[in-house]
């Protein structure tokens, strides 16, 4: 046992326990806080450095430690925390103290009394040292925040349980760290004092006076250091005094804007949550509500008085938000309160109590003025909500706001408490009288808890009773319409059923509440107008006023605050309308009414609309007098908004005729400089301005065309507000002098690094071995690869140069005066170049030519010089003029562009060849412009590197070299000929000399012979004989001396001639052999070291003297080396290759471990694909090879159930998509349900099929369920196997809202969707399906009790349609039932279509039998509802796909009456089944007179009578005719989108010829429509339908209401860019362009990408050409060098669409497929189990019913709802979920009350219903428990499991949002509701 305790695991666990203990962690954090050294350490070091004595050191240390101890204590002691945490109290203490401190240090003897007592504690200076250290330790974290490590303590506090132990240990840790730090400082000081080398420094010794002075002024130095550090710390927070105040918008402007935008009032509150702000860590913004709009910034708490019926009242009276202005009670206010209290005797006592409670009231104005964190400085960020709202919404500090709240009657900490509510509660607490704020006793708390339970139970009981009563009414055979809970309407006359208009009805909310414009109120504020008594609007206003409660009654409720909600009081008072309607109208006061919540903000925040009504009194003369308008105040939580409407610079510029505003723009936009590129002095409109609207902005005068020049670096201003302090940038690294983008170190791997951080093994190996293995075919790269690498290198080089240019440009832009210096230098260089340098060079050149006796070229040079133009350009290079400088060029910068730059040439008359001339011409054409640099050089681009100028002397040198070469060539030829001739001459001369010598010798011989003969003859007897012994031994030589020849000849003359001939021949042979041997020897010496062989003509063999062995060895060596030398290269190659492969394999194998999971995933994916598509290999639409792999996400565990979806097998884009988060989450929930094993106990089945009698489940309902196939009673005992993927896949296949194609899914970004809905308002076109000859149904449709028709105003259209909600309810109910009832029947309809058994039942799907589509689309639902604009969000990437490229097809608009592209109906390909079927279509015909599009009426199309198209390819035209159509009515060419959608669905069925079949080139379209036409077009259909509906449904409405609707729609559609009204004189072209860009430029119609740049380049050239008298030459030159593009110029005025497309100006292209891989795609894959190929869709033909289109305009949701409740066979109930009887709000309330289970007081088991059987009473209201039957309580668990999916996740989100204020939908756990129970699977 002892050994076990010493095991490593136990030892480690023990160490971990010790390390994680509170004490150790506290010590650690305390030790860390030592290093947050702030200004407080300066005093501590000062006492030690100045050597003021031990007393001062001790007092400094004591004060320092005491201050820190107080800081630690303040964490728990609330009063101390409040005292130290209030910024104004700290400031009030610090500022005088700092002043005193500076006086103290500057006047050393200010407090010196001349004598000190012995008791050092009484010494004032020592006490001041103590106070200094104590106080600055306290100030350190608040007025001088050091946020480095101080927050760590507070962070860990929330984690540990024993908090006091943690604080104590952290203080001890801080103390230890502080002692160590002080010891270290003491050691350093001691070392400095003891170090002799420092003290004996010559400089110090020579400056003893300086040292003493330094010692004396040490205090001042410390005060300066303290001041510097204080300023540094103050730099991190906004200064409370030195801030830029915002100028407030004027009252009238603000009022107009407010009322136009929906009267969003903004409330004020003072600094009351300073402590909370510090506690919660909000360093940027206050959390609470915003200030009132019409208040002066410097007088926050002054209440603006409003005159109401002759009485003065403050806003506090009308505004129940209780501004903190109670210190300023006016007598009027007191009187009003006393009136409201009536004759209360204790009124004065209450006022005294209330005033006693307001302590320090005199301090409030100053404190609020300085420290109101809502007002005293500008906000850090300003969120602009697309100009829909008057002021921007303020960010709350956090969604995690901690406060106490009551849940289950107990006080607990809420982590998501609304901060505004917390502030409001705190303000309320200050206003409630002392008697009500007494703490309750435990008995009181218990009673309160019981009361809470009782109230909840009472609510639940009432709801349950109502629910049961409604169900019983159904059982008795009542009509469904009578049983369903209906909307309450405010009626005026019960008999005539005359209700208020929807906009005025307080009971309606959501889309029915339009916005009422109040701008007319300001014009009549002080007037009273008379109108006739039959004015309907006035009547309605009067009626509303008449039913309101009196002010006295309501005011009493307001001031008592008995704990009940005020909104409840209002509701109660509205319910008692009948009682109050009889009261006198004159005594009514107007209060807060009609505060209806409405979610129109895109960020899930709620704002409340308040509607003003005028009090109208009727006088006897039948005329009504309208009093002044009173804006109603309201009760409710507001979205906090910034007080001011701040505008950007660009926003202001977009208003053309805006007056000159003196105030600055509030928001910093991206740093841009406006450069005027054209000023039209003649007020002529520039015809080309509309082409460059994206890049140009008209100035205020409308005469100047300006370009914006943006800085080429990161936008560090990022919509910051001027005057606001921005937080210091942290987590950013800059390692370059001018870094364009500042990144966090987290993203270093994603940025282009200047030096490589990565160690690339393969790249290094390539660099090392590239030369050695490059020739090996295995390692050789292809030519395309080489070209690609070369292209990449070229791009990198280009990018590098571009970055260098940007860096230089930014350098000049950032350095002060750099632009002025550079501009001046450029102008000087331009003048020098043009008028001094170039002329002097021309003169020097021509003088030099004359000196060299050549003709001068004065004329040519001066002509080229005069052609050179120095054009002044903007900083971006936009050419202006030769003489005109850009505006503010000294500050904004300038470029000088040289057109036709002069190049000095040594001669102009080129005598070169034609090819050289052509080359020169090309070069000249390319380089005929440049930019001047500050050094006088030429650059191709602004700030580019200087290019090489053609040298003047280079051609001269070339010519000189050519001439030298020619001379050399001639000399070489001469020498060659001369040598040849001399050689021949020498040879001849040699032969001649030999001949002469021979002759001479012959003569000599003859002469000798003659002399000899003469001598013999003379002497007679004497004869001389010569000796010949030496003849045989003589050496053969070429020389024949006369002596030897004479000797030989003397022997025998005939013998001599033969011998001489042989000798001569031998000599002639030997000479060339000897020469050849010498040459070979010389050549071999270069390659091999050969022995020096002396070859002479005397030796007959060269190798005779070499030993045989040596010769043999040398021969072998020579042969071996000769073989080895060619093989050596291959040997080295193979060796290096082997090394390379080994290293490479190792480098590859390294990530193999990490890749295994991915590979397994891939294998599983292949298995899944094989599993799913095993029967579909031969089917169309699936490209197996192109399937994308699932990106590895480790959170998905059940990989085998995830189907991989590729681009190719998702071919359906017309499936229904619900783009709200709830349906996605619900789909995911169903997927999770499908993954879990189903229980073997099916209690719901037994619940339904039980024989007992229950009040809810009747036999009639059971029979109805049985006939519908919901369950089979005979199959109740069958066991349900586990749900496999196939079953759920087959069932979900029928639910088209889950068949989300990848194209659709990739666009379902919820935020984008929400924004898109609000931005792209659509005119919905609905058609409804009507049952023949059903009078009841017609009456039901006309009944106004179920109001699901949608108001077509744009303000309303952004809300989700009720039809979708009804469809969702229906789908969820079906799925729930099928999930529960699955497996009890053989042909369970999960496998097939829903409810196959009842053939005549109509369901909202469309079924096809013969050739079904890949996915179901509902036949009776407008496809526009799920193929609208909001789903089509353009993306940038266009992956390869097998779809048609639309750019090669030129469409043309057509009006063919026989077959229109527009007449594609729903996906009914089997038209033959119902010959008389009338397909519901919405046709879109393009009519030239009206503009772009015009909506026709619904056409009834009989496909049998349709004319066949001329080109019918295998019957596909008929299929194309009935393709699904998209509702792109507000787009440019809607039929193209439909074609594309159809083509994408089945790309193989639409022949290309048909797409381009009808060409009508003569039909031309104007691409622009006027602004007024746009409004007219958009409202035309809507107004007609609105009028119909108003006339039918609301007989009380009149033309004025309709006018309001129209104006609303118009107003909401046009953007409001400014605070001021837009002028009506806006040019038509600008309006057209705005409309065009806003509507159609986004997705479908786009310019050619290079076209934008071409147009910008054209504009740059136009700017120059417009200023020239004769622009022809410059224009031609610009076209030649490609600066001006003629194709981009619209020369023809009227161009057909086909022409525009042919020219490449317009490109029609589809919305591109997205390739985003994110979490949403993973969710999509979970739903992807529903995707099955079309061949598996087998449905019942009987399910299709005959329907026809009705002309009337009704919302489709009526049928949807009706089909769920009313059936063809007259059964009046089809309630899959009984709670659908109730309205949505009551349903939600019932669910929440049931889920809370308030009777269970055990906090741990929140939902005991799921955990034990005791909670089954929650279901008792649905089912009467039969006491005789032994019913298992677990049956009700199954009932809960069935009901809960119908609770729907959006309901849960609503519960979170409104009950628990959780804004984020992912924080479901905050609600403490367990969604799904854990079951034990038996």
Curated annotation (Swiss-Prot):
Keyword Protein transport tagged: yes
Swiss-Prot/TrEMBL GO biological process terms: protein transport
Regions of compositional bias (Acidic residues) in chain numbering: 251-262, 293-304
TM region(s), chain numbering: 18-38, 64-84, 87-107, 124-144, 172-192, 221-241
Basic and acidic residues: bias regions: 263-283, 1578-1615
Disordered: region residues: 246-308, 779-800, 1578-1626
Any Pfam family matching the protein: Ycf1
Topological type in the membrane: Multi-pass membrane protein
Keyword Cytoplasm: no
Subcellular location(s) per record: Plastid, Chloroplast inner membrane
Principal cellular location given in the protein's record: plastid
Biased composition (Basic residues): 1616-1626
Gene Ontology cellular component terms for the protein in this record: chloroplast inner membrane
Alphabetic keyword roster: Chloroplast, Membrane, Plastid, Plastid inner membrane, Protein transport, Transmembrane, Transmembrane helix, Transport
InterPro entries for this protein: TIC214
Protein origin, superkingdom: Eukaryota
Its biological purpose: Involved in protein precursor import into chloroplasts. May be part of an intermediate translocation complex acting as a protein-conducting channel at the inner envelope.
Family to which the UniProt record says this protein belongs: Belongs to the TIC214 family.
Oligomer status and interactors: Part of the Tic complex.
Name this polypeptide is given: Protein TIC 214
């Amino acid at each position: 046992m002892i050994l076990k305790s010493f095991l490593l695991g136990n030892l480690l666990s023990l160490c971990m326990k010790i390390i994680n203990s509170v004490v150790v962690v506290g010590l650690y954090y305390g030790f860390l806080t030592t290093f947050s050294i702030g200004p407080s350490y300066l005093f501590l070091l000062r006492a030690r450095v100045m050597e003021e004595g031990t007393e001062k050191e001790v007092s400094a240390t004591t004060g320092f430690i005491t201050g820190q101890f107080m800081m630690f204590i303040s964490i728990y002691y609330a009063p101390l925390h409040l005292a130290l945490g209030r910024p104004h109290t700290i400031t009030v203490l610090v500022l005088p103290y700092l002043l005193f401190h500076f006086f103290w240090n500057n006047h050393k003897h200010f407090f010196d009394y001349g004598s000190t007592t012995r008791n050092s504690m009484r010494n004032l200076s020592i006490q001041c040292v103590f106070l200094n250290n104590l106080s600055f330790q306290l100030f350190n974290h608040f007025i001088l925040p050091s946020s480095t490590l101080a927050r760590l303590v507070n962070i860990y506090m929330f984690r540990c349980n024993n908090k006091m132990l943690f604080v104590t240990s952290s203080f001890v840790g801080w103390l230890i760290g502080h002692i160590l730090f002080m010891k270290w400082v003491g050691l350093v000081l001691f070392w400095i004092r003891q170090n002799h080398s420092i003290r004996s420094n010559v400089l110090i010794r020579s400056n003893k006076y300086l040292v003493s002075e330094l010692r004396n002024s040490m205090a001042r130095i410390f005060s300066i250091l303290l001041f510097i550090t204080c300023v540094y710390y103050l730099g991190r927070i906004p200064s409370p005094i030195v801030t830029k105040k915002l100028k407030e918008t004027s009252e009238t402007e603000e009022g107009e804007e407010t009322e136009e935008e929906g009267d969003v009032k903004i409330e004020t509150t003072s600094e009351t949550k300073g402590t909370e702000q510090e506690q919660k860590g909000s360093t940027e913004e206050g959390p609470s509500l915003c200030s009132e709009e019409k208040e002066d910034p410097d007088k926050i708490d002054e209440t603006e008085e409003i005159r109401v019926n002759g009485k003065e009242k403050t806003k506090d009276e009308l505004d129940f938000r209780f501004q903190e202005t109670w210190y300023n009670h006016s007598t009027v206010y007191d009187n009003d309160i006393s009136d409201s209290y009536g004759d209360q005797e204790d009124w004065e006592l209450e006022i005294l109590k209330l005033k006693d409670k307001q302590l320090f009231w005199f301090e409030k104005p100053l404190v609020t003025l300085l420290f109101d964190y809502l007002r005293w400085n500008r906000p850090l960020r300003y969120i602009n909500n697309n100009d829909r709202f008057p002021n921007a919404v303020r960010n709350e500090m956090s969604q995690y706001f901690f406060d106490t709240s009551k849940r289950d009657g107990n006080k607990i900490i809420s982590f998501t408490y609304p901060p505004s509510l917390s502030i409001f509660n705190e303000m309320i607490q200050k206003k409630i009288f002392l008697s009500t704020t007494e703490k309750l006793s435990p008995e009181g708390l218990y009673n309160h808890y019981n009361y809470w339970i009782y109230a909840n139970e009472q609510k639940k009981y009432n709801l349950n009773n109502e629910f049961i009563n409604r169900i019983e009414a159904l059982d008795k055979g009542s009509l469904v319409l009578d049983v369903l809970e209906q909307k309450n309407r405010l009626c005026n006359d019960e008999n005539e059923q005359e209700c208020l208009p929807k906009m005025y009805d307080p009971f309606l909310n959501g889309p029915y509440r339009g916005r009422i414009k109040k701008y007319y109120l300001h014009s009549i504020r002080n007037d009273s107008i008379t109108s006739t008594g039959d004015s309907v609007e006035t009547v309605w206003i009067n009626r509303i006023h008449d039913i309101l409660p009196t002010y006295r009654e309501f005011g009493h409720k307001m001031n008592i605050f008995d704990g009940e909600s005020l909104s409840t009081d209002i509701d109660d008072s509205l319910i008692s309308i009948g009682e109050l309607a009889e009261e006198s109208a004159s005594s009514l006061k107007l209060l807060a009414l009609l505060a209806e919540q409405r979610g129109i903000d895109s960020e899930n925040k709620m704002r409340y609309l308040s509607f003003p009504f005028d009090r109208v009194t009727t006088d006897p003369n039948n005329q009504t007098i309208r009093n002044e308008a009173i804006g109603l105040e309201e009760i409710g939580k507001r979205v906090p908004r910034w007080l001011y409407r701040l505008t950007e610079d660009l926003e202001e510029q977009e208003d053309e005729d805006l007056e000159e505003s003196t105030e600055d723009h509030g928001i910093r936009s991206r740093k841009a400089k406006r450069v005027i590129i054209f000023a039209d002095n003649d007020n002529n409109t520039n015809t080309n301005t509309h082409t460059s609207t994206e890049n140009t902005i008209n100035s205020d005068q409308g005469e100047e065309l300006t370009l914006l020049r943006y800085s080429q670096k990161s936008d560090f201003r990022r919509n910051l507000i001027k005057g606001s302090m921005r937080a210091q940038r942290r987590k950013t690294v800059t390692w370059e002098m001018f870094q364009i983008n500042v990144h966090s170190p987290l993203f270093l791997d994603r940025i282009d690094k200047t030096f490589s951080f990565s160690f690339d093994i393969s790249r290094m190996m390539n660099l090392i071995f590239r030369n050695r293995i490059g020739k090996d075919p295995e390692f050789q790269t292809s030519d395309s690869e080489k070209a690609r690498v070369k292209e990449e290198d070229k791009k990198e080089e280009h990018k590098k140069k571009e970055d260098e240019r940007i860096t230089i440009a930014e350098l000049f832009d950032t350095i002060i005066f750099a632009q002025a210096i550079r501009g001046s230098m450029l102008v000087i260089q331009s003048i020098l170049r043009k008028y001094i340098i170039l002329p002097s060079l021309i003169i020097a050149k021509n003088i030099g030519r004359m000196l060299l006796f050549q003709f001068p070229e004065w004329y040519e040079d001066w002509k080229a010089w005069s052609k050179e133009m120095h054009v002044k350009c903007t900083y971006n290079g936009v050419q202006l003029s030769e003489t005109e400088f850009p505006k503010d060029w000294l500050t904004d910068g300038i470029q000088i562009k040289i057109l036709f730059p002069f190049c000095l040439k040594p001669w102009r008359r080129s005598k070169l060849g034609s090819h050289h001339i052509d080359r020169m011409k090309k070069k000249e054409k390319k380089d005929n412009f440049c930019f001047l640099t500050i050094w006088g050089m030429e650059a191709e681009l602004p700030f580019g590197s200087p290019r090489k100028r053609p040298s003047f002397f280079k051609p001269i040198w070339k010519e000189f070299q050519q001439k030298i070469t020619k001379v050399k060539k001639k000399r070489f030829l001469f020498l060659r000929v001369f040598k040849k001739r001399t050689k021949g001459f020498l040879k001849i001369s040699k032969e001649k000399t030999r001949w002469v010598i021979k002759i001479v010798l012959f003569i000599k011989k003859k002469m000798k012979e003659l002399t000899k003969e003469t001598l013999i003859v003379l002497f007679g007897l004497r004869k001389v004989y010569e000796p010949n012994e030496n003849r045989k031994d003589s050496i053969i030589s070429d020389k024949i001396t006369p002596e030897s020849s004479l000797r030989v000849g003397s022997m025998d003359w005939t013998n001599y001639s033969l011998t001489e001939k042989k000798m001569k021949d031998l000599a002639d042979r030997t000479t060339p052999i000897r020469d050849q041997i010498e040459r070979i020897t010389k050549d071999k010496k270069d390659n091999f070291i050969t022995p020096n062989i002396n070859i002479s003509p005397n030796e007959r063999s060269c190798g005779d003297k070499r030993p045989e062995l040596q010769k043999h060895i040398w021969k072998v060596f020579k042969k071996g080396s000769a073989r080895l030398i060619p093989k050596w290269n291959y040997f080295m190659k193979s060796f290096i290759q082997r090394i390379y492969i080994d290293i490479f394999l190792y480098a590859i194998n390294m990530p193999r471990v990490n890749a295994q999971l991915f590979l397994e995933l891939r294998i599983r994916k292949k298995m899944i694909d094989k599993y799913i598509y095993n029967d579909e290999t031969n089917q169309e639409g699936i490209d197996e090879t192109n399937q994308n792999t699932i990106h590895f996400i480790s959170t998905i565990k059940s990989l085998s159930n995830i189907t991989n979806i590729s681009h190719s097998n998702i071919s359906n884009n017309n499936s229904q998509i619900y783009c709200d988060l709830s349906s996605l989450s619900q789909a995911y929930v169903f997927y999770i349900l499908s993954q879990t094993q189903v229980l073997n106990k099916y209690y719901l089945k037994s619940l339904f099929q039980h024989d007992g009698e229950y009040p809810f489940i009747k036999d009639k309902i059971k029979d109805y369920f049985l006939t519908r196939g919901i369950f089979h009673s005979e199959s109740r005992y069958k066991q349900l196997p586990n749900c496999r993927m196939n079953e759920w896949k087959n069932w979900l296949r029928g639910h088209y809202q889950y068949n989300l194609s990848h194209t659709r899914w990739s666009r379902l970004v919820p935020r984008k969707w929400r924004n898109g809905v609000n931005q792209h308002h659509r005119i919905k076109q609905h058609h409804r399906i009507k049952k023949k000859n059903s009078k009841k149904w017609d009456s039901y449709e006309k009944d106004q009790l179920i109001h699901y028709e949608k108001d077509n105003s744009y303000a309303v259209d952004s809300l989700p349609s009720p039809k979708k909600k009804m469809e969702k309810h229906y789908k969820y109910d079906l799925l729930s039932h099928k999930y529960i009832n699955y497996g009890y029947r053989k042909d369970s309809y999960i496998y097939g279509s829903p409810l196959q058994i009842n053939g005549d039942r109509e369901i909202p799907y469309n079924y096809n039998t013969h050739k079904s589509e890949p996915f179901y689309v509902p036949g009776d639902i407008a496809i526009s509802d799920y193929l609208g604009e909001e789903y089509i969000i353009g993306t940038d990437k266009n992956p390869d796909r097998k779809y048609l490229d639309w750019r090669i097809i030129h469409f043309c608009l057509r009006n063919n009456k026989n077959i229109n592209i527009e007449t594609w109906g729903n996906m009914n390909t089997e038209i033959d089944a119902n010959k008389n079927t009338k397909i519901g279509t919405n046709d879109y015909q393009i009519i030239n007179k009206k503009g772009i599009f015009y909506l026709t009426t619904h056409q009834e199309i009989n496909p049998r009578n349709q004319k066949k198209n001329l080109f019918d390819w295998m019957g596909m035209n008929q299929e194309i005719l009935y393709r699904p159509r998209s509702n792109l009515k507000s787009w440019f060419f809607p039929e193209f989108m439909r074609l594309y959608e159809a083509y994408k669905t089945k790309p193989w069925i639409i022949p290309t010829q048909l797409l381009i079949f009808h060409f009508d080139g003569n039909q031309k379209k104007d691409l622009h429509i006027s602004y007024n036409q746009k409004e007219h077009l958009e409202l035309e259909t809507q107004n007609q339908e609105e009028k119909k509906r108003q006339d039918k449904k609301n007989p009380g409405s009149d033309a004025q209401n309709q006018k309001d609707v129209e104006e609303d729609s118009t107003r909401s559609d046009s953007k409001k860019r400014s605070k001021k009204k837009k002028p009506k004189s806006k040019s038509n072209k600008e309006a057209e362009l705005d409309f065009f860009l806003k509507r159609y430029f986004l997705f479908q119609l786009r310019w050619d990408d290079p076209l934008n740049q071409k147009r910008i380049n054209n504009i740059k050239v136009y700017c120059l050409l417009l200023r020239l008298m004769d622009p022809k030459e410059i224009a031609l030159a610009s076209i030649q060098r490609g600066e001006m593009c003629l194709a981009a110029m619209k020369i023809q005025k009227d161009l057909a669409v086909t022409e525009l497309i042919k020219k490449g100006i317009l490109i029609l292209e589809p919305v591109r497929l997205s390739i985003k891989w994110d979490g949403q795609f993973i969710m999509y894959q979970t739903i992807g189990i529903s995707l099955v190929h079309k061949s598996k869709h087998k449905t019942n033909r009987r399910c299709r019913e005959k329907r026809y289109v009705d002309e009337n305009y009704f919302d489709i949701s009526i049928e949807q709802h009706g089909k769920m409740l009313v059936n063809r066979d007259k059964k009046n109930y089809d309630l899959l979920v009984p709670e659908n009887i109730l309205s949505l709000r009551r349903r939600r309330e019932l669910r929440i009350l049931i889920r809370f289970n308030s009777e269970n007081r055990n906090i741990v088991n929140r939902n005991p219903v799921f955990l034990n059987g005791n909670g089954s009473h929650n279901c008792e209201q649905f089912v009467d428990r039969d006491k005789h039957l032994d019913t298992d309580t677990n049956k009700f668990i199954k009932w809960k499991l069935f009901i809960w999916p119908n609770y729907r996740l959006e309901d849960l989100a609503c519960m979170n949002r409104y009950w628990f204020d959780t804004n984020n939908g992912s924080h479901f756990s905050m609600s403490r509701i367990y969604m799904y129970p854990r079951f034990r699977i038996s």
